């Protein structure tokens, strides 16, 4: 069953004002252009510029820094958004994710495929066949891969709509995490679905993809 508890440390809640655009637009980067454990924070900053937000937290005592980039458009009803995040430990990339609700590159996925994934049996190759290409990948130490030797594939999607004559924004976010051991066999799966409704307000810090650990 999907969990509906708050995510750690941030839940995506896109808050806009009027017809403003928030952030500079960007396209989906090619995952092959990143190498986990090797790509540096300096390279990401040079490539994408100043992030919308930046946070730091500890995973098993190890400091992980996350850079987040966001772009949104305020429309009549739907409020499409793109976000991407990059996590680093000691200056090297340990994870990245991309989320979009724009029609051109939306990252919707079928969470029902989770029912066919078996812990201790399903391989990463089989999981990719069932769910498709992930929006993000993480290695230890990160919020999705919290033990040495583990890696995780992440699937993220968010949809926002204006309610109450445009005075309220309702956002529904889905994040599926599939963690693998050193043999690329599934050890954990975690599906989180959250819905939030907030007054429209320009708050860039809330436009960040969620980073929740496995439970």
Give the location of each predicted region.
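Short amphipathic alpha-helical segments with coiled-coil-like heptad repeat character
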Residues: 1-2, 136
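Residues within mature, well-folded domains
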Residues: 22-215
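Bacterial N-terminal signal peptides that target proteins for export
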Residues: 2-11
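Bacterial N-terminal signal peptides
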Residues: 10-19
């Amino acid at each position: 069953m999907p969990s509906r508890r708050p995510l750690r440390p941030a839940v995506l809640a896109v808050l806009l004002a009027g017809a403003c655009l928030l952030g500079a637009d960007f396209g989906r980067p090619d995952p092959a252009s990143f190498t986990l454990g090797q790509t540096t924070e300096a390279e990401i900053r040079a490539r994408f510029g100043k992030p919308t937000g930046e946070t730091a937290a500890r995973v098993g005592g190890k400091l992980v820094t996350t850079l987040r980039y966001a772009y949104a458009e305020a429309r009549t009803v739907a409020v499409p958004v793109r976000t991407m995040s990059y996590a680093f430990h000691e200056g090297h990339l340990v994870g990245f994710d991309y989320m979009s609700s724009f029609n051109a590159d939306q990252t919707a996925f079928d969470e029902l495929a989770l029912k066919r994934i078996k812990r201790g049996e399903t391989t990463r190759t089989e999981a990719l066949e069932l769910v498709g290409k992930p929006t993000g990948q993480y290695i230890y130490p990160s919020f999705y891969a919290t033990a040495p030797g583990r890696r995780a594939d992440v699937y993220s999607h968010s949809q926002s709509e204006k309610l109450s004559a445009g005075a309220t924004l309702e956002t529904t976010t889905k994040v599926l995490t599939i963690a693998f051991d050193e043999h690329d066999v599934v050890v954990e799966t975690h599906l989180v679905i959250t819905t939030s409704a907030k007054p429209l307000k320009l708050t860039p810090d809330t436009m960040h993809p969620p980073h929740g650990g496995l439970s």
